[in-house]
Amino acid sequence: MSWRGRSTYRPRPRRYVEPPEMIGPMLPEQFSDEVEPATPEEGEPATQRQDPAAAQEGEDEGASAGQGPKPEADSQEQVHPKTGCECGDGPDGQEMGLPNPEEVKRPEEGEKQSQC
């Protein structure tokens, strides 16, 4: 079997994106007001300023809670209707072995072979 015809692949033209203008060297002093969060007053609870490790532990607890004991395998079993092409997909298919290649009838060129 040989493939004939032209490929339909056409590369897209490259788009040129202009680099951002250089403003100058970035100094940390310029961002000192924006980087540090405002400190809460004495009467307000410090909900924004939490220890990152404590926040991460809280996330891990939620993930581990979902990984509890696994349900039985029977409850996860899904029923799929047979389409006639599942050779060896169940208890009936385990009894079937591979056919002897000498006994297999080869389809002629004009005949169509059923495909799943």
Swiss-Prot record:
Residues 1-116 are annotated as: Disordered. Residues 71-80, 102-116 have a biased composition (Basic and acidic residues). InterPro entries: GAGE, GAGE_fam. Residues 31-44 have a biased composition (Acidic residues). This gene belongs to a multigene family expressed in a large variety of tumors whereas in normal tissues, expression is restricted to germ cells. These genes organized in clustered repeats, have a high degree of predicted sequence identity, but differ by scattered single nucleotide substitution. Their sequences contain either the antigenic peptide YYWPRPRRY or YRPRPRRY which is recognized by cytotoxic T-cells. Belongs to the GAGE family. This is G antigen 10. It comes from Homo sapiens (Human). The gene is GAGE10.
